[in-house]
Structures are given as structure tokens and as C-alpha cells.
A protein has these predicted regions:
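Active-site histidine-acidic residue metal-binding/catalytic motifs
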Residues: 1-69, 95
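Loop/turn elements at helix/coil->beta-strand transitions in domains of secreted/extracellular proteins
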Residues: 2-4, 48-54, 76-81, 123-127, ...
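Active-site-adjacent mobile loop/cap segments within catalytic or ligand-binding domains
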Residues: 7-9, 18-21, 74, 81-87, ...
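Solvent-exposed loop/turn segments at secondary-structure junctions
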Residues: 13-15, 60-64, 86-91, 104-107, ...
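A short, glycine/acidic-enriched catalytic loop
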Residues: 15-31, 88-119, 123
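Second-shell loop/turn segments in exported
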Residues: 26-34, 56-61, 100-106, 162-170
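Extracytoplasmic/secreted envelope proteins and their assembly/folding machinery
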Residues: 40, 44, 68, 97, ...
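Sec/Tat-exported extracytoplasmic proteins
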Residues: 43, 47, 51, 75, ...
Length: 190
């Protein structure tokens, strides 16, 4: 029997390589390049230790093209790739959790996207914004969404929003546990 592989990718890996959040939070500011690594590693640790899931992590030093090449070389259609991000907007009132899927997502990707969206929003207490397709983003096409497996981008919250930033820092351990549990359920149901 094939064991589902979960691939967790930290978007914008490395300090100050992604969005940088507001500086008025009691916890400091979200540095997307750091927080995606922290969240990825914590979720993977829980998946391994508590649920016995097979988890593959991206290498923090690789460029996205290399990450995608490596993933393509080891996955099959039953596997699941989740890339973690923190959203940012010029409008500091933008808030909530989003999921991004390819233009033509599979039913399984939509199902997983809804589950991750709701799990994240519930764990953090953020608004459920939406599930978007890649063309509804400023980037138009996102390579990570074109793998030979189910692929989802999770925008955890808006680091440009003070409330989102504070509830993320206050609840990030709770979020990691909730995501790990949901991902373990996904892996066992596929």
C-alpha cells in the first residue's frame, strides 16, 4: 500500500525574503521568510512525532525552481504539497486567511483547500477570506500549483494587519497542532 507523502514548503525562506509585517504588535513583526520556516518545521515535527506521517520539507537554501524540480522527481498524484505564506497588503485593514489553487483545481485540491482554510481560521480566529485561483493573485501563475500532486498555497494571515499579526503570534502553536491534525486526516483519507 502506498504511503501518502506530505510536502511542506516554506514560502520566501530566509529572513527578510518575503513580506515584513507591521511593527506595532506586542510580539514584534512577522517576517514571512522566518515564520514560514518556523511553521513548516513545527507542523512537520508534530506530523512525524504524533501522527507518523511521511513528510518531505523543502531546503531553505534552494531557489523555487530547484524546489519544484526536486518535488516533481519524488511525488505522485496521491501526494499533497502545501506551501505556507503570510499575506500582505498596502491597506492595513485587509485581514484573514486565504487559500490559492490552480486555475483548474481538482476536486481533491478544492476539498483540501477548504479544510486548510477553515482549520487555520478556526485555530487563529481570523476571517475566512476566500479560496482564490492563481489568476486572481498579482502573480497570475504560480509554479508550485502545477505539480503532479495536489498542490495548495495557504496564506495564513495578513502580516500587514496588526490584529492578524497579534493573533498569529498568540496562537501559532495552536495553529501548528491544528494544521498537523488536519493534514494527518487528509493523508489518511486520500
Amino acid at each position: 500500500m502506498y504511503r501518502i507523502m506530505i510536502i511542506l514548503v516554506a514560502g520566501h525562506t530566509g529572513a527578510q525574503t518575503g513580506a515584513i509585517g507591521v511593527n506595532k504588535s506586542n510580539y514584534g513583526r512577522i517576517d514571512e521568510g522566518y515564520e514560514t520556516i518556523w511553521l513548516r518545521n513545527r507542523v512537520a515535527q508534530i506530523l512525524n512525532e504524533k501522527y507518523g506521517c511521511y513528510v518531505l520539507l523543502d531546503d531553505n537554501k534552494d531557489k523555487l525552481a530547484v524546489v519544484i524540480q526536486k518535488i516533481k522527481s519524488v511525488v505522485n498524484k496521491d501526494d499533497v504539497c502545501i506551501e505556507l505564506h503570510f499575506n500582505s497588503a498596502k491597506n492595513s485593514t485587509a485581514c484573514g486567511t486565504e487559500v490559492i489553487l490552480s486555475e483548474n483545481p481538482t476536486d481533491e485540491e478544492v476539498k483540501i483547500g477548504v479544510q486548510l482554510l477553515n482549520t487555520t481560521a478556526k485555530a487563529l480566529g481570523t476571517n475566512v477570506r476566500s479560496i482564490k485561483t492563481e489568476r486572481q493573485t498579482p502573480h497570475n501563475q504560480l509554479a508550485i500549483l502545477h505539480l503532479p500532486c495536489s498542490s495548495i498555497i495557504l496564506e495564513v494571515c495578513f502580516c500587514s494587519n496588526l490584529h492578524d499579526s497579534e493573533i498569529y503570534f498568540h496562537n501559532r502553536e495552536k495553529l501548528a497542532a491544528a494544521l498537523a491534525k488536519q493534514i494527518a486526516l487528509i493523508a489518511n483519507k486520500l
